[in-house]
Structures are given as structure tokens and as C-alpha cells.
Amino acid sequence: MKLAITIILVMLSVCYSSDTCPGFLQVLEYLFMGSESTYEAALKFYNPGSDLQNSGMQLKKLVDTLPEKTRVNIVKLSEIILTSNLCNQDPSF
């Protein structure tokens, strides 16, 4: 569970910009709300190689153990962060 939360936070730290793949938010939505097969297909689109594909599927299995409300809220939070004008600024936490 700690690993899943850590990976989620790392993914959320990527801000939406011209350097960020437009499909990133869609892949996140499949991770949190899609079926395993839908998420797997989204990963395969990017040709990650078998080790990365397997790691992504392990992450999906961990994420699927979270309550649905938590997963929905993580997607909403991701959308807010990735589409925020603040993403263009250097965060000083």
C-alpha cells in the first residue's frame, strides 16, 4: 500500500505542460477507474517492455484495493493538479 501511495504521489508531481504527454491523464484514469484489461491496453500503446508492463499491472492491482471513493477523488485531484496554471511555476513546498 505504501508503494502504491508513493508511486501515485510521484505521478501527481508531474505537471501538465507541453512536455507532458496528452494521454497521461487518460492513462491515470484507466489506472484508477478502468478495468485491468483497459489499463493494460493503454500501457501497451506506449511499448513499455515486459518489466515495466508487469510493474504497471502490479500497481493496478494495488490501486484496485483502494475504496472506489478514494480512487475517484485521486482522479479528481490529478485533473486539478495537471490542468492548473500553477503547474507552470516552480513549486517551492
Swiss-Prot record:
InterPro entries documented for this protein: Secretoglobin, Secretoglobin_1C-like, Secretoglobin_sf, Uteroglobin
Any Pfam family hit: Uteroglobin
Record keywords, A-Z: Disulfide bond, Phospholipase A2 inhibitor, Secreted, Signal
Domain of life: Eukaryota
SMART domains assigned: UTG
CDD domains documented for this protein: Secretoglobin
Location in or out of the cell: Secreted
Signal peptide boundaries: 1-17
GO molecular function (one): phospholipase A2 inhibitor activity
One Gene Ontology biological process: signal transduction
A cellular-component GO term for this protein: extracellular space
Similarity comment text for this entry: Belongs to the secretoglobin family.
Quaternary structure (record): Antiparallel homodimer; disulfide-linked. Interaction with LMBR1L is controversial.
Name listed for the protein in its UniProt record: Uteroglobin
Originating species: Neotomodon alstoni (Mexican volcano mouse)
Lineage of the species this protein comes from: Eukaryota, Metazoa, Chordata, Craniata, Vertebrata
